[in-house]
Amino acid sequence: MPEETQTQDQPMEEEEVETFAFQAEIAQLMSLIINTFYSNKEIFLRELISNSSDALDKIRYESLTDPSKLDSGKELHINLIPNKQDRTLTIVDTGIGMTKADLINNLGTIAKSGTKAFMEALQAGADISMIGQFGVGFYSAYLVAEKVTVITKHNDDEQYAWESSAGGSFTVRTDTGEPMGRGTKVILHLKEDQTEYLEERRIKEIVKKHSQFIGYPITLFVEKERDKEVSDDEAEEKEEKEEEKEKEEKESDDKPEIEDVGSDEEEEEKKDGDKKKKKKIKEKYIDQEELNKTKPIWTRNPDDITNEEYGEFYKSLTNDWEEHLAVKHFSVEGQLEFRALLFVPRRAPFDLFENRKKKNNIKLYVRRVFIMDNCEELIPEYLNFIRGVVDSEDLPLNISREMLQQSKILKVIRKNLVKKCLELFTELAEDKENYKKFYEQFSKNIKLGIHEDSQNRKKLSELLRYYTSASGDEMVSLKDYCTRMKENQKHIYFITGETKDQVANSAFVERLRKHGLEVIYMIEPIDEYCVQQLKEFEGKTLVSVTKEGLELPEDEEEKKKQEEKKTKFENLCKIMKDILEKKVEKVVVSNRLVTSPCCIVTSTYGWTANMERIMKAQALRDNSTMGYMAAKKHLEINPDHSIIETLRQKAEADKNDKSVKDLVILLYETALLSSGFSLEDPQTHANRIYRMIKLGLGIDEDDPTVDDTSAAVTEEMPPLEGDDDTSRMEEVD
C-alpha cells in the first residue's frame, strides 16, 4: 500500500471501532469461566504460552520454504512482562500473528467443535485444566483477567487490536500504537484479587510446572532495584528528577528512595581528602531471565530422566491435567537416525474417532526444528491416541506434505513407531491393573488395528481381552482361553451380541455350556469387524456359535444318536420348510440346543444377527448391499424338546392341519427374536400373540360384549389353530 494512502486512512481507522457479539456457545463458556470458582486458575498461563508456541511453530514452518517470512523479525521467542503499577500481565510472542479475519473468527465468532463438549465436561465435574484439550484455551485468560487486549500483526495484514471485558461482545480496531513487526501481544488486565500472577516467584513457579519444555525461549521481564554509588552532585540531580516525576504523577507523598551511607563512612571520607563525597541511591532497572533453559527432553539419555520429568513434559506437550499411563523413550541409529518419545494417555479424548480431527498427535521435528503436528503418514489411524515427539536426523528441513507422502524415510520411521507402540502395550499388559485401565479406554483401537493392520495382526490379537462363559467378571486373553481348552476341542468358540447378559443367556451357547466348553463373549460392535479378519489364533480357528455347521467334540455314540434323531425328524423338517418357504434356506435338526425349542442360525459367510442389526443402524447404509449380505437363515429345531416332539406327532397325523402351519410360523418368528433378528412385520406377530392370550383367557371371539373396535382388530388378526378354511395364513404373510 502506498504511504500516502496509509496516512490519509489513518485518522478514519483510528476512530473505526467495530463491535462483534460472541457466538452463543463461547459467551456461555466465558460466563461459566467467570462466574464459577476454580482453585487452579494458574493454568491460564500455560494455555497462553502454549498458543504462543503454536504461533511460533507456524511461522518457523512457513519460513522453511520462504525465508523472507522472517524479515519482519528473525528472533522467535516468548516474553512475559508483569506490570504492578498498571496491574497487567503481558504475554508477547513473535509468532505468525493474526489477520483481522483470524482475530474475529478465532477469538469469538466461530465456536470450535470442543466448546460445547468442554462445557458439558465442566458441568459434569471435569477439571478446568482440561480446557486446552478442547481447543478453547485462550478463554482461560478470563479466570484471572477482567479485561483482555490482544494486539497482533500478521505479515499479510495491518496491526489490529482486539479487546473484550467478556460482556457478550468484543471490539476490533486498527492499532496505531508501537509497531510490532510480527506476532501477538496478549495484555491481561488482572482482577484486583489476582495480583499474585504479577509476582516474579509465582510466574517462575507456573512456567517451571507447566511450560519448561516449550521449544522457544520464555523470558521474564521484571523491574528491580539495585544500589548505585554516585557522587553528591549526581545524587542531587537524581533526587530533583525524581521529585519532578513524582509531582507529575501527583505522588508527592512518597519520598525519593535515597539511602544515606553511615556516619562512619563519612568520617573516613573526610579523612581522605582526595576522594569526593559519595552517596548510595536505589536505581530501577529491567531484569531479563530465561525461564526454560532445559534442553529438549527427548535428546537426553532415558536413564537420566525421572518419572516426574516425563510427567511434566507430557503435560506441557498435551495440556492434559492427568499423568500419562505409560511412556516409551527410544532412539534408532544406523542407516536411519531418529529419536522418539511416546506416551499413552490415561483416558481417550472425547473426539477420538471424529473424522474432522487431526489424524495423530505426534509432533514431527527435524534436527530439533518443529515441522508439523498432524503428519498422517507418521502413525496409523488406530494408534491416533498416542502422544509424543519424533525427531529425525535424515529428513530435509523444508520438507513438504507431498514429499512426506512419498518419503521412504518416513515409512521406516512409521514401521518403527508401530513396533515400539506394540512393545509398550505388551509391557503394559504385564501389569494387570494398569492394563485394565488402558483396555477400557483403547480396546476399540486395538480391534481397529486387527481389522486394518494385517502385518501386526498376530501381535495385536495377543492384546485382546474378553469376558467368557467361564471367566466371571474378569476379562481374559485368547492365550488364557487356549490353555483352558478341552483335550478334544479343536476350535475357539465365540458369540457376538449387545450385552454380556444377553449372550450368556442365548440359546446358541446352551449345549456348549452343558459340555463345559468355554465361549468368548464379544459385545462391542467393532468385534464383528475384528473377527472378520481374525480367522485364527495359535493355529486354532475362531468359530461363531451362531452360524451353521457348528462342530462340537462328540464321541461315536453321540454321533449315532444324532443321526437317529435326524432320521426321525426328517419329515417334520420338510413340512416346516414347505410352510416357511423362502423365509428360510433350510430346516435341520440342531446339535446346539438344550432348553430352547428352536433357533435361527446364519450361513458361514453371511452376517450374524448382531452384524445385521449394526448395519441396519448405519445412517448411510446401502440398501442394495443389505439384500445380498443379509445372511441366509437356517431354522434349527431341538429334537429333545416337547414342543417339537408334539408338533412332529401332530404333523404326521395330519400334515394339512391348519394349526400346524400357525404354530410353525409362530415358532419361527419367536426364534427370530430370541436369535437377535428383528421382525419385518412386528404387528402381525403381536396380533398372533394377542389371539393366543384371548384363547388362554377363554375369551370367545363371537362374544357380543366385545366392542366394535376390538372386533375390527380381530378381523385383521391372523388365524390360529382350529379356525375354519375361510381364514388364510397365506394372505397375512
Swiss-Prot record:
It comes from the Eukaryota. Residues 9-236, 272-617 are annotated as: Interaction with NR3C1. In the resting state, through the dimerization of its C-terminal domain, HSP90 forms a homodimer which is defined as the open conformation. Upon ATP-binding, the N-terminal domain undergoes significant conformational changes and comes in contact to form an active closed conformation. After HSP90 finishes its chaperoning tasks of assisting the proper folding, stabilization and activation of client proteins under the active state, ATP molecule is hydrolyzed to ADP which then dissociates from HSP90 and directs the protein back to the resting state. It catalyses: ATP + H2O = ADP + phosphate + H(+). Residues 285-733 are annotated as: Interaction with FLCN and FNIP1. NCBIfam families: PRK05218.1 (NF003555). Molecular chaperone that promotes the maturation, structural maintenance and proper regulation of specific target proteins involved for instance in cell cycle control and signal transduction. Undergoes a functional cycle that is linked to its ATPase activity which is essential for its chaperone activity. This cycle probably induces conformational changes in the client proteins, thereby causing their activation. Interacts dynamically with various co-chaperones that modulate its substrate recognition, ATPase cycle and chaperone function. This is Heat shock protein HSP 90-alpha. It comes from Rattus norvegicus. The gene is Hsp90aa1.
